[in-house]
Structures are given as C-alpha cells and as structure tokens.
Swiss-Prot record:
Keyword Transit peptide recorded: no
Any one GO molecular-function label of the UniProt entry: mismatched DNA binding
Function (record text): This protein is involved in the repair of mismatches in DNA. It is required for dam-dependent methyl-directed DNA mismatch repair. May act as a 'molecular matchmaker', a protein that promotes the formation of a stable complex between two or more DNA-binding proteins in an ATP-dependent manner without itself being part of a final effector complex.
Protein name: DNA mismatch repair protein MutL
Species this protein is from: Agrobacterium fabrum (strain C58 / ATCC 33970)
Name of the gene this protein is made from: mutL
C-alpha cells in the first residue's frame, strides 16, 4: 500500500483524539486560552454534560479578524515563536481550536479591546467559514456544540452526562484555585450555577471557596525554597483528611498538573500521620525557571518532567514535614463539630433521624431523650434520666475511694492544652483550658510521644545496636552480596553491621536494637530483593520507623490505666512540646477541643 499525505481535517481529528478526550478537556483548553488572554471574568455554560454545549465567555484582550482566521489553523499561536524552553503561558501548541473544530461545531466571536466591531468565524467538522463582522462585547466567546458529532465512535467512550458535568466542575475548580484574581461562573441546563468571586491576591480565601471554610481553619502555610525553586501553598493538618486524593491540588508555574511524582511526594510527606486509606488535603504551587521543567510531555499537559525530580520531591517532603513539625500538634477542628453534633437530639453517625415530636411535654423534657428511630439514642447511647441519678447519702466511703474521686489539684489553665481535671473511663483525660475544655485519648497521645522520641533518636544519632553472640551467616547469590556491600555504610548508620564472609555469603554482626528479636535471615534477604529497585537504606529506615511505631503502641500508656493528676498534666505538657502530637501513629486525633462558646450553645446560653 502506497504512503500518502493525510488531509488536514483527518490530521486535526487525530490530534483531537489526543488533546480532546472528553468535554472537560475542551473546557480546560478554552479556559486556558481565556486566562492567557488576560481575562478577569470567565463564564462557562454547558448542556448535556458538555456534549451538547460548552460556551466560554471572557473579557480578555480579544482577537482581530486576522488573528481569528489564524486561530483555527493548526500550530498557529501568539505564545511561542522559537523555543520551548521559556513557556510562560498555559497554552502554546496552537492545537486546541483546530482540533475541536474538526470534531464539533465551533463558533468564535471576538472583539479586541478598543475596537469598534467584532468578528465571528465558524468551523464545522473541519470546514472553516469566512470571517464575518459581528456585534460583540470586548473579549471572546467560544461556543462548542455537538462535540464529537464528526467522530461518533468517540461518544461511546464518554461517561454519563452527570459524570462529564462533574469533570468540568473539577476543571473549573482547579483553574479557580490557581488564579484567585479571576471571577468564574459555571452554569448550564444540567447544573446549578457555581459562582466563584474574585479574591484578588488572597489565595487562602479562594481555597476556602473551593475546599470549604474548614480547610482555612485546618491549613498550615507552606513557604520554602531550594536552588531557585520555591514552594508555597497550604497543607491540611494530618487529622483533616479525605477518602480520596481529589483534594490535592498542585500547580507548576501556575499550571494545574496531576503528576504522579508530585502526588507521591505529598503522600510521602504525610507518611505515618494519616490513616491507611485516607488522603491529606493540600494546595501547593511550585515556581521555577521554565527551562527546568518540560510541560510538553503529555497531550493534555497534565504531566510535567523536571530536570531534577529529586530536588522537587525533596523540597515538597521536607517543606510539608517541617510545617507539620511546627504546627503538627494541632488537631482538626472537625472533631469539635462532630462532638457538637453528637450532643444534638437524634444525632447518629449513620444518618438516622428522630421521629417527629409534638409540642413540649414531660415525656420529651430534658430529663428524657427524644425518641429516635432504631436503637440509636441521644448522643449515641441513652442518657440517664435525672430521676435515676443516685442521691447523696451519709454513708462513709473508704479513704482510698474518696481520694480517687477527687478532682486533680488546680493547675494554671493558660497552657494550650490546659490543666487536667478528671479522667473518664480510665482512658480519656478531661482538661480545662482558658476558653473551653480538651478531651485527650491518653493511649493515642502517649503512643505518639513514645514514637517521636524513638524516631528522633533514629534520625539524630546512630540507633543503638545489639551485637550478635554468634554472627549470622547468610548464603546469597554473588550479585546480591555485591549490592548489599555497596550499601554497607548506610546499613551501619542504621545499626545493621554486615561483612563479607567469603564468596556468596554475608555475615551479620549487629542488628538494630529497636528491632529486638528479628529474623536476620529474612531481613537481609528482603533487603537484597528490594535493593535492586529502591534505595535499600531508605527501605530499612522506613522499616525501623514502622517497627518504632509498633513498639510505641505496645509501650505506651494503655487504655484502662488510672492516671494520677500529675501524670495527666505531665502528658499534656509533653504533647504541647512534641511535634505531630495532634494525631497518633495511625493518623487518628489524640485530642478534641471544645470551646466554651460551643458548650454554652449546647445549653442555649448564647
């Protein structure tokens, strides 16, 4: 079969298959064009999940009739001219408009700022009309109808209208976070209007618009730099987490990306602070010389390649961990709101609702909980009636019981976690603060303190090792022995001392004391397998931290142990001085704070 030149329309349709995967892809490309045009107001209207209509209206610089004619031609752009090493705009290929026009019905109406009249051009299935005069406000309107009508096979791969509309919403949210000075409005027949007002230069306020006010209350500021690379943004405290990674936003030179390297760095930064299956919330912006990052490696420009990926990963992990160390003793404010909800009549985490109640009567007075559906009762368990409370008697109590029942001696309440006042169910410490109270899970809190102490010893100095009375000799393939010995110095720094023991054998003379009784054969063989793929030293370090966490769990104050007042206060003071004490090793909160105003609201005093 002879080789022949493809038609321009077919070339554009092939390009559209890479650039325009779904309606949200078209929306992304068009919104990027509006931002590059300097728009401060962008309106997006959709129908049919974007399959029927996507209309982008902006107040940007607009286009002249000559520019409009070139805009629908492939690889015509005003954003680059000679090189890809200095890309400072979101778009640069000149592919989006001709690609969309080849598979849909495209109409562009535009008027330059200061021009008396606008112009319009249409592209239907790759066929371009002449440029015509048109009435138009300053700026540009791009209308895409019947997406993929020219390639109907593509329609079979689209999701439901609801799913496609949700994908468009996510695109708009990402753009809105990156550009807080722009007002976005998203509307259409298949959605309620989403209006995102401009917040100027206040990035945190824009994040609160998108992620909710709770994020603002639980965010830690990130501001770090290394070798002309800066990292700014906000990261949530570990206990403020979500069930998926959709609340992680990363921007490179203002460009929203979903790069695996960057998302992996965020996960690494929160290692051992977020529960398994939960994901931290973060909004990070990386700024660097455009020459040091390649944004042209993915058709949709969602992935990037850094000249020094190790530098970027290290910066993200280090900056977040430093911020968590600085403010990591904070617990998420959502705990207090959940506690408040638990005290409300009829509350249940499973969503059970109380039965309709009549007007006030003795049967529904505060001395008796409101009736609710199922077995759930007020505050999850039925509260005792006031009439059931045992009245005081003149019977003498043993002195030991009397002393144990007394509240701890008064302590200053000006500490961040206050002064211990009581212990509930031999597991929870109640502390009074200057403006409320704190409830501490004693086991989770002490578990974190022990773990941090062990981890500090691990990273600040060589962990203690235990000398084996008889060295363990392990037979391995020669290549495994070579790889292990290449990393012997790194192992030694972690307390594992190995030596050559002739051909195809390794002698283990010392093991980390933290590991206790360890299967030396299994450990070394596992390291030999892993070292071919990862850095074995870091693998061992992670193993040591995991073991340290396990040991801390077993060595901490157990639930069910009665603590003396001075022990409770000592635990509170240690928590205040320990980074990351706001959550245990498994990512659960160690304490919940309830403000006095919240308590007063429970009793209707506010």
């Amino acid at each position: 079969m002879a080789i022949k030149q493809l038609s321009e329309t077919l070339i554009n349709q092939i390009a559209a298959g890479e650039v325009i995967e779904r309606p949200s892809s078209a929306t992304k490309e068009l919104v990027e064009n509006a931002i590059d045009a300097g728009a401060t107001r962008i309106e997006i209207a959709t129908a049919g999940g974007g399959k029927g209509l996507v209309r982008i209206t902006d107040n940007g610089s607009g286009m002249s009739p000559a520019d409009l004619e070139l805009a629908v031609r492939r690889h015509c752009t005003s954003k680059i001219s000679t090189t890809l090493d200095d890309i400072r705009t979101l778009g640069f290929r000149g592919e989006a408009l001709p690609s969309i026009g080849s598979v849909a019905k495209l109409t562009i109406t535009s008027r330059q700022q200061g021009a008396e009249q606008g112009s319009v051009i249409s592209v239907t299935g790759g066929k371009v009309s002449d440029v015509r005069p048109a009435a138009s406000n300053a700026g540009t309107i791009v209308e895409v109808r019947d997406l993929f009508f020219a390639t109907p096979a593509r329609l079979k791969f689209l999701k439901t209208e609801r799913a496609e509309a949700a994908a468009i919403t996510e695109v708009v949210k990402r753009m809105a976070i990156a550009f807080p000075h722009i007002r976005f409005v998203l509307s259409g027949t298949d959605r309620s209007t989403l209006e995102i007002p401009s917040t100027g230069d206040d990035h945190l306020a824009r994040m609160a618009q998108i992620l909710g006010a709770e994020f603002k209350d639980n965010a830690i500021e990130i501001d770090a730099g290394r070798e002309d690379v800066t990292l700014t943004g906000f990261a949530g405290v570990p206990t403020f987490n979500r069930g998926n990674s959709s609340h992680q936003y990363v921007f490179v030179n203002g460009r929203p990306v979903q790069d695996k390297l960057l998302l992996s760095a965020i996960r690494g930064a929160y290692a051992e602070t977020v529960p398994h299956g939960r994901y931290p919330v973060a909004v990070l912006s990386i700024t660097l010389d455009p020459a040091f990052v390649d944004v042209n490696v993915h058709p949709a420009k969602s992935d990037v390649r850094f000249r020094d990926p190790g530098l970027i990963r290290g910066l993200i992990v280090g900056a977040i961990r430093q911020a968590l160390t600085r403010d990591g003793d904070r617990a998420a404010t959502t705990g207090a709101s959940q506690m408040m909800n638990a005290f409300r009549p009829g509350y249940s985490p499973s969503g059970l609702r109380p039965s309709p109640s009549a007007t006030w009567s003795a049967a529904t007075s505060p001395s008796r909980p409101l009736a609710v559906s199922g077995d759930m009762q007020f505050a999850e368990a039925a509260q005792s009636r006031f009439s059931d409370i045992t009245m005081p008697t003149a019977r003498a109590e043993p002195r030991e019981a009397y002393e144990a029942s007394q509240s701890p001696s008064p302590e200053p309440v000006l500490y961040p976690l206050g002064a211990a006042r009581a212990q509930l169910h031999e597991n929870y410490i109640i502390a009074q603060t200057e403006n409320g109270l704190v409830i501490v899970d004693q086991h989770a809190a002490h578990e974190r303190l022990v773990f941090e102490e062990m981890r500090n010893a691990l990273h600040s100095r060589r962990p203690p090792s235990q000398v084996l009375l008889i060295p363990e000799i392990i037979d391995l393939p020669e290549e495994d022995c070579d790889r292990l010995m290449d990393h012997a110095a790194g192992f030694d720094a972690l307390g594992l001392v190995i030596e050559r023991f002739g051909p195809g054998a390794i002698a283990v003379r010392e093991t980390p004391a933290m590991l206790g009784e360890v299967n030396v054969q299994g450990l070394v063989r596992q390291l030999a397998d892993e070292i071919a793929e990862w850095d074995a030293a870091s693998t061992l370090a992670n193993k040591l931290e995991y073991v340290a966490a396990t040991m801390a769990c077993h060595g901490s104050v157990r639930s069910g142990r009665r603590m003396r007042p001075e022990e409770m206060n000592a635990l509170l003071r240690q928590m205040e001085n320990t980074p990351g004490s706001g959550q245990c090793n498994h990512g659960r909160p160690t304490y919940i704070e309830l403000k006095l105003s919240d308590i007063e609201r429970l009793f209707g005093r506010s």
